[in-house]
Every structure is written in C-alpha cells, then in structure tokens.
Amino acid sequence: MFDIGVNLTSTQFAKDRDQVVKRAKDAGITGLLITGTNALESQQAQSLATRRPGYCWSTAGVHPHHASEWSGETAATLKRLAESPEVVAIGECGLDFNRNISEPEQQVYAFNAQLELAAELAMPVFLHCRDAHDRFLAVLTPWLPTLPGAVVHCFTGTREELEACLAAGLSIGITGWVCDERRGVELRELMPLIPADRLLLETDAPYLLPRDMRPRPPSRRNEPCFLPHIVQVVAGLRGEEPEALGRQCDANARKLFRLPA
C-alpha cells in the first residue's frame, strides 16, 4: 500500500511528524509521496523526504489556490527542487474553479508553466481538478505526448469525467472521499470502471478523514496509517481482495513515479 498524497508539511503534523510516519510503517504502508503546494511547501516537502530516504518522496509544484504567487523565481525554485532524487513529480498543479482563490486565468497560466516544466524535465505530473474539467483537459491534453505520466489526485468527478480522463491516459487517485456515504455515492459506483493499472490510492492527510471509520480518532485528523481502511472499501466496491489491491496500487505508484520496487 503506497500513499500517493500526504500533506506532511501541514502544521497539523508539526508536533508528531515522526510518529505519523512510524504509524504508517507499522500499518503496512510501503511509501509516502509528500505533496508540495507552493514554492515554500515544496522545499519543505523535499526536505522531509530527504530525511526519510527510500520511504518518502515528494512533489514540487504550485496548487491552483496559490497560482497568483507564480513568478520566474517560483519556476526557478521548482526546477532546482526537481533535480533532487527525492522529487519525483511536478505538482500539485491544475485548476480549481470551485472557490477561485486565484483568478482563473492566473490558474491557467501557472498550470501551463508547470506542464512546460514537467515536459522539459520529463517528469510525471500530480494534478488537481475541481469544477474545471473541460478547461483542465483543454490545457492538459496538448502536453500529454511530452509527459511520462500523470495522475488526477483526489478524483471526485462524474462518470463522464472519469471516462474522459481515462481516455486521455491519466491515472486516477482515490481518497477517503469514496468512504463518504453522502458525498461519495457516485464515486463509489465508478470504482469498478477504473482499470487496475491506473488506480492509485491516497489519504490526502491530514484532510479527508474517511467518514465511515470506526472508531474515529479523537483529533479527527487523517493520517497515512488509515490508508488500509480506504483500500478495504475500494476493494469491496471492486470485488477484489484488499491485499491484492494494495499490492497493485503500490506497483502502479512505483511505475508512475519511477521508484525502486
């Protein structure tokens, strides 16, 4: 079981980060990908991964919420970070028109710039898309022939959107959203449609604690050690054995991010 989306730089983990990683290992998690969401957090993510070689890796990128911060200096920082062996993908990048914390055109500009960087460096991309599917694919599609791979992190879209992403050759990241009996109803129905070699699993910790976890942790904070719960739910929806699904998703992550087996 490999967790491809952990916000380990979050201040929610400031007091017990080492224990969080230990609990993940004890729970059978085979590796963690630490998400970078702006220049500073990408540097922090790389630093955290460096201190945990062979178990943690990181991404370097600018989340659409931070797109207004994009600059030449940002691009230079990400490029420098991407030279580190611990940094295995560009992102989290993409479009988020749900809240438009950054203006849509700022988001498109930063997204294009990061896709260009990923193409230049021949690195996979770690993608974010919310309420922006058509524009997202319109921006992304021309770059796909130049990219070695891409995953849509925390996919929560419709069947039509899933089919479009799969047709474009994208991998699909599934979080504990699928465990939500209210918001995750449609997503649950889509689980059997994702090809086995395109499915990746993630907690997005400390966010998106699975709603159906019992007992719920007193802190209500999500952790990578809860990934087995997501694996179990997804396996049930796909009619598969959890152990086999965990191994498959681990192999998928290592192939996409070019990590040792």
From Swiss-Prot:
InterPro entries attached to this UniProt entry: DNase_TatD-rel_CS (IPR018228), Exonuc_TatD (IPR024918), Metal_Hydrolase (IPR032466), TatD-like (IPR001130), TatD-type_Hydrolase (IPR050891)
A GO molecular-function descriptor: magnesium ion binding
SUPFAM superfamilies on file: Metallo-dependent hydrolases
EC number: 3.1.11.-, 3.1.13.-
Binding-site list for a divalent metal cation: E92, H128, H153
Cofactor(s) needed: Mg(2+)
Main location: cytoplasm
Reported function: 3'-5' exonuclease that prefers single-stranded DNA and RNA. May play a role in the H(2)O(2)-induced DNA damage repair.
HAMAP family assigned to the protein according to its UniProt record, in alphabetical order: TatD_exonuclease
Assembly notes: Monomer.
Protein name: 3'-5' ssDNA/RNA exonuclease TatD
